[in-house]
Amino acid sequence: MPLSYQHFRKLLLLDDEAGPLEEELPRLADEGLNHRVAEDLNLGNPNVSIPWTHKVGNFTGLYSSTVPVFNPEWQPPSFPHIHLQEDIINRCQQYVGPLTVNEKRRLKLIMPARFYPNLTKYLPLDKGIKPYYPEHAVNHYFKTRHYLHTLWKAGILYKRETTRSASFCGSPYSWEQELQHQTSTRHGDESFCSQSSGILSRSPVGPCVRSQLKQSRLGLQPQQGSMARGKSGRSGSIRARVHPTTRRSFGVEPSGSGHIDNSASSASSCLHQSAVRKTAYSHLSTSKRQSSSGHAVEFHNIPPSSARSQSEGPIFSCWWLQFRNSKPCSDYCLTHIVNLLEDWGPCTEHGEHNIRIPRTPARVTGGVFLVDKNPHNTTESRLVVDFSQFSRGSTHVSWPKFAVPNLQSLTNLLSSNLSWLSLDVSAAFYHIPLHPAAMPHLLVGSSGLPRYVARLSSTSRNINYQHGTMQDLHDSCSRNLYVSLLLLYKTFGRKLHLYSHPIILGFRKIPMGVGLSPFLLAQFTSAICSVVRRAFPHCLAFSYMDDVVLGAKSVQHLESLFTSITNFLLSLGIHLNPNKTKRWGYSLNFMGYVIGSWGTLPQEHIVLKLKQCFRKLPVNRPIDWKVCQRIVGLLGFAAPFTQCGYPALMPLYACIQSKQAFTFSPTYKAFLCQQYLHLYPVARQRSGLCQVFADATPTGWGLAIGHRRMRGTFVAPLPIHTAELLAACFARSRSGAKLIGTDNSVVLSRKYTSFPWLLGCAANWILRGTSFVYVPSALNPADDPSRGRLGLYRPLLHLPFRPTTGRTSLYAVSPSVPSHLPSRVHFASPLHVAWRPP
């Protein structure tokens, strides 16, 4: 007969009328009983005959998350001009005095951050903006492009100008090597132009280079590109540098990222013959290569012959402006839109500063798309950047690990009678600058509108840009595109032209889609908080990622602290969002928990999710293990607040590990339901002296409670860890002490998931809220009783217990200003010093 919930509760000793613990508890360690219960609760049998359930409430399988919804009204969030001060260490030192080694190391890590991937895979520009919303492709393209433009304007992205130079907006850092600004009318230029026309001898390209550049701002890129670059050069070192630049530029520039800016590009004014000769024939050698590699974006409408017939006037290689002179092909021809405006503005924009960068190809390394900013804010969009290539495959980067305080440490730290407020750091990731050397690895961008549209509507016809007839220009005209562009014209106006061009952008601040970023952000905020705690000794400052909380004794004190700390952070260049500052009173909401003087509980929205989860949980139906992963994720978060904790979820974990479907029996569901509907706070540990000790051997157990000694034997020999756990349970139930000394590391770790299931559940409830102190076997007063010797008394140890705060040190003492004595070197081994109990 299946086990009823009442019986099961009684079995787990969760009811009060259980028999003496010394008899009842060892039974739960019995393997036979555990198997019988598992069979009764239907935990172990993978019933494959019934089809699996793939959806429970909102939980679907791990990889089929909810489909994002496109919102045509999305606005990109506004980014303040974020510029973290480069001398942040000095500024902190002026404020607090010398920094600790730890703080210095962390702040140096992010000034600037560096990124060294093992291998970078370059993707074609078409993959720059992901076709995430096929119905709203054009709209999504422009919204994303606008978002990228906003980021570039805010100084968060670099724009690739040429293979070796990039431009950006905002204040430069010292590690960004600026290219010197020089006007291109220098005496070398004239002779160079006339000389080139001599070499090219077919057409008067030379003299009209500049006029043409003025007219279209991007003439025939490959031809003029290398000539129109009158630019910084030390003639000695040029030879080495020009070769690669000019040669690469043919395959690269047409993709539109680098339109030539006379005042800034990294080739030189003294181009020598070979380079020029290459330019002369480039249109013959490269137009074929380009169209096959699919990168001749801006170049594709120009028949190869046109290079020779330049007397006919300027040729617009700009896809958008070409519509101006063509006849409309239909009512929905783009010509109608292009003729709406006389002046569409420049084809490209250039940043305020130009810097040298490592060689950067005209490719992207990750795709981007837009989603809602968060579930509560659907009016603003958020850019999702997919740099997952760095986390996959054999060449993946192993990201650094960093310590996050566990629940108990967090409670010990923050559970107090302080008043709290939390600060909101706006765009926290975008505070941390990246070294330009990382730019070639973190590229995003787009191939320009014509390519994007062509790729989406590729109706099996091969889009061949080789023979650029006028008909090809109108291939992209369609009713959908026309309607979308008309609507977008209202929003973006003449920016439509700018956004329809290709662009390649690299990150200047750390992006969110790289595993390095959370680590760097955590280092940054924890170092800042450490400095704040020292500067304001009466303030508790603590951070997790971009969530910074401040605590103080009284509300008035908190407000004055808030003002001075905000000013301090602003002086470092950290942007706070004053509208989002939350004042919590005495119970702090942090990391999904509510933390008050009574301890910690999960936040209300999580309790609500738990209730919904149990309401939707089907009984006697096999549930796909991927859905179980989702369920366990939620239940695992709240497990420490239940009676039986994690051990209660062990059957689910086992099932997921073996990739089997899991069937909830009514009793197991009722058991879990009861567990999760009554949550108990996790209390803060208090420091104290340990007076109660437990020890066990496989056959017996012994306790030392104050000056009393007790012992007992087990009916059958048990594994040593199980015996030690039982002894600890007896010590707790006999003495009621919250502090118990034990010499077993497994009991000490308070992870009871590896014990027999029933015993783990029961022990978790008995030992809930107990702290353990390690005592070496040789000094354990309970050692003798456990071996059956009651007569021998070892002296009771005075073992102090200090609550753990994990690896978060709240009390970093500022280093004293060093004296000028040489530091002594110690050769004594730390291991030979007399051992003291921790």
Curated annotation (Swiss-Prot):
<dbReference type="GO" id="GO:0046872">
    <property type="term" value="F:metal ion binding"/>
</dbReference>
<dbReference type="InterPro" id="IPR051320">
    <property type="entry name" value="Viral_Replic_Matur_Polypro"/>
</dbReference>
<feature type="site" description="Priming of reverse-transcription by covalently linking the first nucleotide of the (-)DNA">
    <location>
        <position position="63"/>
    </location>
</feature>
<keyword id="KW-0511">Multifunctional enzyme</keyword>
<dbReference type="InterPro" id="IPR043502">
    <property type="entry name" value="DNA/RNA_pol_sf"/>
</dbReference>
<feature type="region of interest" description="Terminal protein domain (TP)">
    <location>
        <begin position="1"/>
        <end position="177"/>
    </location>
</feature>
<keyword id="KW-0255">Endonuclease</keyword>
<dbReference type="GO" id="GO:0003677">
    <property type="term" value="F:DNA binding"/>
</dbReference>
<dbReference type="GO" id="GO:0004523">
    <property type="term" value="F:RNA-DNA hybrid ribonuclease activity"/>
</dbReference>
<comment type="similarity">
    <text>Belongs to the hepadnaviridae P protein family.</text>
</comment>
<feature type="binding site">
    <location>
        <position position="424"/>
    </location>
    <ligand>
        <name>Mg(2+)</name>
    </ligand>
</feature>
<keyword id="KW-0695">RNA-directed DNA polymerase</keyword>
<feature type="region of interest" description="Disordered">
    <location>
        <begin position="215"/>
        <end position="238"/>
    </location>
</feature>
<dbReference type="GO" id="GO:0003887">
    <property type="term" value="F:DNA-directed DNA polymerase activity"/>
</dbReference>
<dbReference type="Pfam" id="PF00242">
    <property type="entry name" value="DNA_pol_viral_N"/>
</dbReference>
<keyword id="KW-0540">Nuclease</keyword>
<dbReference type="InterPro" id="IPR037531">
    <property type="entry name" value="HBV_DPOL"/>
</dbReference>
<dbReference type="GO" id="GO:0006260">
    <property type="term" value="P:DNA replication"/>
</dbReference>
<dbReference type="InterPro" id="IPR043128">
    <property type="entry name" value="Rev_trsase/Diguanyl_cyclase"/>
</dbReference>
<keyword id="KW-0808">Transferase</keyword>
<comment type="function">
    <text>Multifunctional enzyme that converts the viral RNA genome into dsDNA in viral cytoplasmic capsids. This enzyme displays a DNA polymerase activity that can copy either DNA or RNA templates, and a ribonuclease H (RNase H) activity that cleaves the RNA strand of RNA-DNA heteroduplexes in a partially processive 3'- to 5'-endonucleasic mode. Neo-synthesized pregenomic RNA (pgRNA) are encapsidated together with the P protein, and reverse-transcribed inside the nucleocapsid.</text>
</comment>
<feature type="region of interest" description="Polymerase/reverse transcriptase domain (RT)">
    <location>
        <begin position="342"/>
        <end position="685"/>
    </location>
</feature>
<feature type="binding site">
    <location>
        <position position="546"/>
    </location>
    <ligand>
        <name>Mg(2+)</name>
    </ligand>
</feature>
<feature type="region of interest" description="Spacer">
    <location>
        <begin position="178"/>
        <end position="341"/>
    </location>
</feature>
<keyword id="KW-0479">Metal-binding</keyword>
<protein>
    <recommendedName>
        <fullName>Protein P</fullName>
        <ecNumber>2.7.7.7</ecNumber>
        <ecNumber>2.7.7.49</ecNumber>
        <ecNumber>3.1.26.4</ecNumber>
    </recommendedName>
</protein>
<keyword id="KW-0460">Magnesium</keyword>
<keyword id="KW-0548">Nucleotidyltransferase</keyword>
<keyword id="KW-1090">Inhibition of host innate immune response by virus</keyword>
<keyword id="KW-0235">DNA replication</keyword>
<keyword id="KW-0378">Hydrolase</keyword>
<dbReference type="Pfam" id="PF00078">
    <property type="entry name" value="RVT_1"/>
</dbReference>
<feature type="region of interest" description="Disordered">
    <location>
        <begin position="285"/>
        <end position="311"/>
    </location>
</feature>
<feature type="binding site">
    <location>
        <position position="547"/>
    </location>
    <ligand>
        <name>Mg(2+)</name>
    </ligand>
</feature>
<dbReference type="GO" id="GO:0003964">
    <property type="term" value="F:RNA-directed DNA polymerase activity"/>
</dbReference>
<feature type="domain" description="Reverse transcriptase">
    <location>
        <begin position="352"/>
        <end position="595"/>
    </location>
</feature>
<keyword id="KW-1113">Inhibition of host RLR pathway by virus</keyword>
<keyword id="KW-0239">DNA-directed DNA polymerase</keyword>
<keyword id="KW-0238">DNA-binding</keyword>
<feature type="compositionally biased region" description="Polar residues">
    <location>
        <begin position="285"/>
        <end position="294"/>
    </location>
</feature>
<dbReference type="InterPro" id="IPR001462">
    <property type="entry name" value="DNApol_viral_C"/>
</dbReference>
<dbReference type="InterPro" id="IPR000201">
    <property type="entry name" value="DNApol_viral_N"/>
</dbReference>
